Regions:
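Catalytic machinery of carbohydrate-active enzymes
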Residues: 1-168
Length: 168
């Protein structure tokens, strides 16, 4: 008997910030493909856990029997695009999420990242509340695969500039 499940597989490889940005589009993908299960294969699965729009999350390199379970003989749509390599991103004409929308065939509606805390996280959320807004600076993209040094002038903010921002 053949599996009648339909799948959308979205593969995201990159840093935590890129994965968090990807959370902005999970609801849009499910809206476009309501009859399909959304399967994520990502480098930071913790950003996608508890997301009600996702049916299954796998860490890159930790998806045994994935081909047999989701691809071989199945009705599947696979998205494995690199939005950072798109002209409009490189030339700073469009935001990362907007470029992803183009690649995924989704209308850009200024979607925002969505993190869904689990039960334990919800119970401890008060520990993070402050009387004023919290700003997070992610000054480095991290080393690329095979990169000799951890700093890359094309991806990382110089430490001196990051330190000045923190001071003010």
């Amino acid at each position: 008997m053949q599996n009648k499940d339909k799948y959308v597989i979205w593969h995201i490889q990159g840093g935590l910030g890129k994965n968090i940005a990807g959370t902005a589009l999970c609801a849009s993908i499910k809206q476009k493909y309501p009859d399909r299960k959304l399967i994520m294969v990502v480098s930071h699965p913790e950003a996608f856990l508890s997301n009600p729009h996702i049916d299954r999350v796998y860490a890159l390199g930790n998806a045994p029997y994935f081909y047999e379970d989701y691809i071989e003989g199945k009705d599947v749509i696979i998205f494995r695009h690199e939005p950072y390599n798109q002209t409009d991103h490189i030339t700073k004409k469009k935001h990362l999420v907007n470029n992803w929308c183009d690649l995924l065939g989704i209308k850009y509606t200024q979607q925002q990242p969505a993190i869904y805390p689990n039960y334990t996280q919800q119970k401890t959320i008060g520990l993070w509340q402050r009387p004023k807004p919290i700003m997070v600076i992610h000054s480095g993209g991290g080393p690329m695969q095979g990169q000799k040094f951890s700093y890359s002038w094309t991806r990382d903010m110089p430490i001196e500039i990051a330190q000045e921002i923190v001071k003010h």
